[in-house]
Amino acid sequence: MPACRLGLLVASLLLGLLLGLPPVTGTGAEKSGVCPAVEVDMNCTQECLSDADCADNLKCCKAGCVTICQMPNEKEGSCPQVDIAFPQLGLCLDQCQVDSQCPGQLKCCRNGCGKVSCVTPVF
C-alpha cells in the first residue's frame, strides 16, 4: 500500500475514534446549597456528573452509588448575632453569596460592616 494511502487510512481511523468519544461535560460553577441526606431505597444510576448537568437550582448529589439532581438544603445552624459596636476585624468585603461557597460547615452570614463572610454557625 502506498504511503499516502496509509497516512489517509491512519487519519481516518483517528478521526473515527475522536468522533466516537463521548463529549466532555463542562465543570460549570457549583450551585448553592448542600445536598440532602441519603435515601436508602435507590437504584445505582448516574443522572449527573456535575451541577452543570442539573436544571435550574438543582444540585448534582452523591447518594451512595447514585448521583442525582436534587433540590439542595442550606447548611445546618444559624448565623451568629453580630455586635454592631464591635464589628469583625479584617477586610470589609463580600466573601460569599450562599452557604455552599463556604468550606466545611461554615455559613455565609452578615459580618457587621454590611458585607457577608464565611463564619462558624450557632447550633
Swiss-Prot record:
Cleaved signal peptide residues: 1-26
One GO BP annotation of this record: antibacterial humoral response
Entry annotated with the keyword Repeat: yes
Tissues where the protein occurs: Detected in the distal parts of the epididymis.
Record CDD domains: WAP
UniProt keywords, alphabetically: Aspartic protease inhibitor, Disulfide bond, Protease inhibitor, Repeat, Secreted, Serine protease inhibitor, Signal, Thiol protease inhibitor
InterPro entries, alphabetized: Elafin-like_sf, WAP_dom, WAP_four-disulfide_core
Domain WAP as annotated: residue spans: 28-69, 72-122
Location(s), subcellular: Secreted
Keyword match Cell division: no
Record SUPFAM superfamilies: Elafin-like
UniProt cross-references to Pfam families, sorted A to Z: WAP
GO molecular function: aspartic-type endopeptidase inhibitor activity; cysteine-type endopeptidase inhibitor activity; serine-type endopeptidase inhibitor activity
Disulfide topology: C35-C61, C44-C65, C48-C60, C54-C69, C79-C109, C92-C113, C96-C108, C102-C118
Major localization listed first in the record, in broad terms: secreted
GO cellular-component term (any): extracellular space
Subunit record text: Homotrimer; disulfide-linked.
Role played: Broad range protease inhibitor.
Protein name: WAP four-disulfide core domain protein 2
Taxonomic lineage from the root: Eukaryota, Metazoa, Chordata, Craniata, Vertebrata
